[in-house]
Regions:
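Amphipathic alpha-helical coiled-coil scaffold segments and their short linker/junction regions
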Residues: 86-91, 147, 239, 243, ...
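Terminal intrinsically disordered/low-complexity segments used for targeting and assembly
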Residues: 2-89, 139-140, 262-307, 487-498
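A glycine-/polar-enriched beta->alpha junction
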Residues: 88-98, 105-121, 150, 157-175, ...
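Periplasmic alpha-helical coiled-coil/stalk elements that build and connect Gram-negative outer-membrane
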Residues: 24-27, 186, 190-307, 419, ...
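Small/polar, glycine/serine/threonine/aspartate-rich low-complexity segments that form flexible
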Residues: 69-79, 125-159, 287-298, 330, ...
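Heptad-repeat amphipathic alpha-helical coiled-coil interaction surface used
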Residues: 104-106, 111-113, 174-176, 181, ...
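A short glycine-centered flexible hinge/capping loop motif at secondary-structure junctions
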Residues: 234-238, 448-452, 489
Length: 498
């Protein structure tokens, strides 16, 4: 008796635990303890994210195959890369191009679905079975007997279904998928151009930072030369401690300028790694670009805008979206019109009979049928009007989007067109400024060394030269950035320098 009670208690506890667990499992998941506290990420979710990033976070495009071999997109730390080489690496490694390519591929594959509906569907099936029928039979001379009939059959069936005519509903669906595939393809092109644009800007920033570093190094050497001259003058009794202090200040300012230029180089390196799709700490050597300044376009602004509008990915995608919406409206209208279809079937086989376990005999069976049907929707409860209004609304929305995109694109092109001209003019002015500042710096430093000038003049002249060289480096960068921007907004950006 005690054993039975103990067993009952254990079973009761187990049942209670199961019920409690079931109730807990059905409780809603709260976002956090309250509106005043943020939601805390569970450790399990952190582990899942880390595992996913380790697996997919830094995988170059060339590493997707089973036989990877050497990675053609690998970086060589001893090689100095040119602009074109970096763009080629970015197009291979940047995950944005891989994602856009897969999306374009998915859109292209989606066109196969409506294409398949234009063709007949062929299906094969097999039906088999066994049946026993027992029937009592009254004999003429009295008494009854049971007649047992066994029937078994295996019948293969071939069926063909073909929608012959639907007033263009399937064709409209095919047009929709074709236009959406066009959208995905031009978005893939836009992703490539965005990568090229990002690499161009990062390369220009790295080049400008390198020139600023070189200018800061020259300014630092000049400051040390001035400090040495001040100390020599003091030793000869013709200088003062004030001059030495001013020279030390100039030296510190030159060192600060060098540190700032090195910081700009580090920032440019991070941006370049982001554009390439490489880890942010990767060291990439840049080839000192000796390429000349980009030239301003000889075309007028109106010509540039007219040429660009027909090839910009966002406008091409907007027009394709509009065409898809128009095809969708035609498909909605056709969906409520009659449909004509054909159904044909062919089956053959043998029915095998036996009575009371006697001799089995077969009866051949063959059936052939062809049916043509017409379906006509009569009443949909307002569904047709609702779907048509929704389709027309999508057309109006797409038309407005095209107009908005066109206006924004024209404004972007005009701004980039003028920015390039201004940047080129600024560079030429900065180049003249550097030449003048260089002459003034050399003269002031020589005058101070021979005692006919002051240290203040020499320091100011050296500072003016450094500022002029930094301004020229920025102006050169701005000119290349403006050229890349104009090429980008006109959909003409390629791997070649703009």
């Amino acid at each position: 008796m005690h054993a039975e009670r103990g067993l009952g208690s254990v079973l009761g506890l187990l049942l209670g635990a199961l019920l409690q667990g079931g109730c807990d499992a059905t409780l809603p998941v709260e976002p956090s303890a309250g509106p005043h506290q943020p939601w805390v990420l569970p450790e399990s979710l952190r582990a899942q994210v880390k595992s996913t990033l380790d697996r997919y976070g830094d995988q170059p495009a060339a590493a997707r195959g089973a036989d990877q071999g050497s990675d053609p997109a690998a970086l060589d730390p001893t090689h100095a890369y040119s602009r074109g080489e970096l763009i080629d690496l970015a197009q291979r490694r940047n995950p944005a191009t891989r994602a856009a390519w897969e999306q374009a591929r998915q859109a292209a594959l989606a066109t196969g679905v409506p294409r398949a509906t234009l063709l007949p569907r062929l299906a094969a099936s097999v039906v088999g079975g066994y049946q026993r029928l027992s029937t009592p039979v009254t004999l003429p001379f009295g008494g009854t007997r049971t007649l047992t009939t066994d029937v078994q059959a295996v019948i293969p069936i071939l069926t063909v279904e073909w929608l012959l005519f639907d007033f263009g509903e399937r064709t409209s669906a095919l047009e929709v998928t074709d236009h959406l595939a066009t959208v995905a393809r031009v978005q893939f092109n836009q992703a490539h151009q965005q990568v090229v644009f990002d690499v161009n800007r990062a390369f220009n920033a790295g080049g400008a930072a390198g020139r600023k570093e070189a200018a800061a190094g020259r300014a630092l050497a000049a400051a040390r030369q001035v400090l040495a001259a001040a100390e020599t003058r003091a030793q000869r009794g013709v200088g003062t401690r004030i001059e030495i202090a001013q020279a030390n200040t100039q030296l510190a300012q030159a060192q600060l300028s060098l540190v700032q230029a090195q910081g700009e180089s580090a920032t440019a390196r991070v941006a370049l790694n982001a554009a390439l799709g490489t880890p942010h700490g990767t060291l990439i050597r840049l080839r000192d670009s000796a390429e000349g300044l980009p030239a301003a376009t000889a075309e007028g602004l109106d010509q540039v805008i007219a040429r660009a509008l027909v090839q910009r990915p966002d406008i091409v995608a907007g027009v394709a979206q509009l065409q898809a919406a128009q095809a969708g409206e035609r498909g909605v209208a056709a969906a409520f019109r009659p449909k004509v279809g054909l159904i044909a079937s062919l089956s053959t086989g043998d029915n095998q009979f036996s009575f009371n376990g006697g001799t089995t005999f077969a009866v051949p069976l063959q059936q052939t049928g062809v049916l043509i049907g017409v379906t006509l929707p009569l009443y949909e409860g307002g569904l047709r009007d609702s779907r048509l209004q929704s389709a027309r609304s999508r057309i109006l929305s797409a038309q407005a989007a095209v107009a908005t995109t066109r206006g924004a694109a024209a404004a972007e092109i005009a701004a980039a067109y003028e920015a390039l001209r201004s940047a080129l003019a600024a560079y030429h002015a900065a180049d003249v400024l550097v030449a003048a500042a260089g002459v003034g710096s050399a003269a002031a430093r020589t005058g101070f060394e021979v005692g006919v000038g002051t240290l203040t003049d020499a320091a100011a002249a050296d500072k003016a030269l450094l500022d002029a060289e930094n301004a020229r480096a920025d102006a050169r960068r701005n000119a290349f950035d403006a050229a890349a921007t104009l090429a980008f907004v006109t959909a003409g950006l390629t791997a070649e320098p703009p």
